[in-house]
A protein has these predicted regions:
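Gram-negative bacterial Sec-dependent N-terminal signal peptides
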Residues: 2-27
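Immediate post-signal peptide segment of exported/extracytoplasmic ligand-binding proteins
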Residues: 31-44, 114, 215
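N-terminal lobe/hinge region of extracytoplasmic solute-binding protein
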Residues: 46-96, 126, 212-219
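Hydrophobic residues in beta-strands and at strand termini
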Residues: 47, 94, 103-105, 166, ...
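Extracytoplasmic/secreted proteins, especially bacterial periplasmic and envelope-associated proteins
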Residues: 66-70, 83, 87, 103, ...
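Sec-exported extracytoplasmic/periplasmic mature domains
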Residues: 72, 76-80, 97, 105, ...
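Aromatic- and charge-enriched surface segment that lines or borders ligand/interaction sites
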Residues: 91-139, 173
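Gly/Pro-rich hinge or "lid" segments in bacterial periplasmic/extracellular proteins
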Residues: 150-151, 155, 169-170, 175-223
Length: 223
């Protein structure tokens, strides 16, 4: 990815073959009546600065955040009015604002066809707070109140002690240190987006390169 290419724009190709899996019909874009769509659906986003990384936990500014939202999808999204709407999670529940249960879509897919599961979120959130990963956004897990995040970030506990678990492939349980009534809205933050464990472990620091990156968003990296 050259600086010259970045100045022209950052090209993302629509996951046409997997769009039905990437987004449920309820989440599909609403096209205004009378609007003619181009045969080739793609977005070319011009950004001022080259992104430091396409890894959600390495994002440090607006360029990375914009691209992360194109390439990945979290538990929830926000509509044009800022209202929380389903993302990978179809619904959620809590009785005390301290323990949250999220129920995931069974048709959610990574761009390589693998299913997106609750275990992907467990891995990704643990990866966020793992001190060795030096995430500039690790503090967000602490801000969100996820159980043990502070102790893990400071190196006092291992990452697998984070208050997140997967009772089954499509159920995610989150335990907080204290009640946080607005926690669901916080999961729309890019730092809590899932990543594909197999791809990250296979390619290491090169997992975000063109040809390697696997996302679960509406768009995939092309060049």
């Amino acid at each position: 990815m050259t600086g010259k290419k970045m100045q022209r724009g950052f090209r993302l190709a629509l996951c046409a073959a997997a769009i039905g899996a990437c987004m449920s019909s309820a989440m599909a874009a609403q096209v205004p009546p009378g609007t003619a769509l181009a045969d080739k659906q793609e977005i070319v986003r011009h950004i001022k600065d080259e992104p430091a990384s396409l890894d959600p936990i390495k994002a440090v500014g607006l360029p990375e955040a914009q691209l992360a939202r194109d390439l990945f999808e979290g538990l929830v999204n926000q509509d044009a009015n800022g209202k929380v709407i389903p993302g990978v999670a179809t619904r959620w529940q809590t009785s005390d604002n301290q323990t949250y249960i999220f129920y995931l879509r069974k048709d959610a897919r990574w761009s390589n066809g693998d299913p997106v599961t609750a275990k992907d979120f467990v891995y990704s959130w643990q990866r966020l707070v793992e001190p060795k990963n030096l995430s500039p956004f690790a503090w967000f897990a602490q801000l969100a109140g996820i159980q043990n995040a502070e102790q893990i970030i400071s190196g006092k506990l291992p990452a697998d002690r984070l208050g997140v678990s997967a009772p089954d492939d499509y159920t995610l349980k989150v335990q907080l240190d204290k009640p946080v009534p607005y926690f669901v809205s916080l999961t729309a933050n890019f730092s809590l987006f899932p990543v594909n464990k197999a791809v990250v472990e296979k390619y290491g620091n090169d997992w975000t390169k063109v040809g390697n990156l696997v996302g679960n968003g509406a768009f995939k990296l092309q060049e």
